[in-house]
Amino acid sequence: VEKAAELGGKVVAMCDSNGYIYDPEGIKLDIVKDIKEVKRGRIKEYADRVEGATYTEGKGIWNIKCDIYLPCATQNELDLDAVKILIANGCKYVAEGANMPTTREATDYLMANGVTFMPGKAANAGGVATSALEMCQNSARLSWTAEEVDTKLHQIMVDIFNKVDDA
């Protein structure tokens, strides 16, 4: 969410295992971090704190109109029925942020219907690459700035994208 916002994206929905929040003005990450990291609360508290935000219990976050959908939690959370709703709502890109959150049937349907699909093995590579960059720093006793790490990570992700796009 943080990287999406940093790159100019407007994240309007987010879920946990109990339900999802929707904020048409864009999720306020500082409030989510306070709820989840500081208070160890549930995401539904966001709707109590932010005017105009709503909370919906249970599944169904894919019912919200979006350009990009990032399934980042549960294995097989995106099935055929869910991706049909996403496509009907205008989704053009799905990038997995979890281990196999999209069923094979749903993946095939996304690609057959012109949705750009980034599998988790490629999309999650940023976390693995960042860990590798940290290991390089530690072994060489270097200290890169966050901007230097981000620049190196950006090039790694561009290379991965090009390889996936060529496949």
Regions of interest found by a model, annotated:
Residues 1-3, 23-29, 82, 105-107, ...:
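Short acidic, glycine/serine/threonine-rich loops at helix termini
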